[in-house]
Swiss-Prot record:
Partially overlaps RRP15. It is found in: Membrane. It is a multi-pass membrane protein. GO terms for cellular component: membrane. The chain crosses the membrane at residues 80-100, 105-125, 129-149. The keyword Membrane applies. Its main location: membrane. It comes from Saccharomyces cerevisiae (strain ATCC 204508 / S288c) (Baker's yeast). This is Putative uncharacterized protein YPR142C. Keywords: Membrane, Transmembrane, Transmembrane helix. The keyword Transmembrane applies.
């Protein structure tokens, strides 16, 4: 299972499906899938004995349009165990998730998602989406500023040329009228 997590990172379009907690994730609905890898200690304790061994854990996030699920699969486990699962109308539009490069960041991500799960998650995601949309519109308007400025200059030049032509015609008319008056006066 570890190899499949490694090979199918960033490849949601392949014919794959992961099943955990009786919830299959279809590849057609997968929007984003990536892995966090870190080397941790997996310990199991019971009333009689306790043991700890090093294992490579793959922390994976699978997103679709209605759920967000966080998996962790180790080399000793036969199937990935689900850590955090959110379902509902979480994603109204594109929600960017940033890939953390530090090894311990996956642990902090689990803590963060666990903390968020105890709070009201959907309003917070809605606020984040509103902020991202406003940021996108702001960046989009900044990118459009040179075009708006160039077209604005053209529009201003057009109106100024019209106004200046009209003004020049008025001046010529005034000059012709004064010349005609002067000729009449001299006659």
């Amino acid at each position: 299972m570890m190899g499949s997590f490694l090979s199918y990172a960033f490849r949601c379009d392949d014919k794959i499906a992961f099943t955990a907690a009786e919830n299959p994730v279809e590849p057609s609905s997968c929007l984003l899938f990536f892995d966090f890898f870190f080397l941790g200690k997996s310990s199991s304790s019971s009333s009689s004995s306790s043991s700890s061994s090093a294992s490579l854990c793959s922390l994976s996030i699978i997103l679709d349009d209605s759920s967000l699920e966080l998996f962790c699969s180790s080399s000793s486990a036969s199937s990935p165990s689900i850590i955090v699962s959110f379902s509902g109308s979480l994603l109204n539009s594109w929600l960017p998730l940033f890939l953390f490069s530090r090894p311990n960041s996956a642990f902090f991500l689990v803590l963060f998602l666990s903390l968020v799960s105890t709070l009201c998650l959907e309003p917070m995601i809605n606020y984040v989406l509103i902020f991202l949309r406003l940021l996108y519109r702001f960046i989009h308007s900044i990118c459009l500023l040179p075009f708006l400025i160039s077209y604005g200059h053209r529009i201003l030049d057009f109106f100024l040329s019209k106004f200046s032509n009209k003004r020049v015609m008025e001046i010529h008319q005034n000059e012709s009228q004064t010349k005609s008056k002067q000729t009449l006066f001299t006659i």
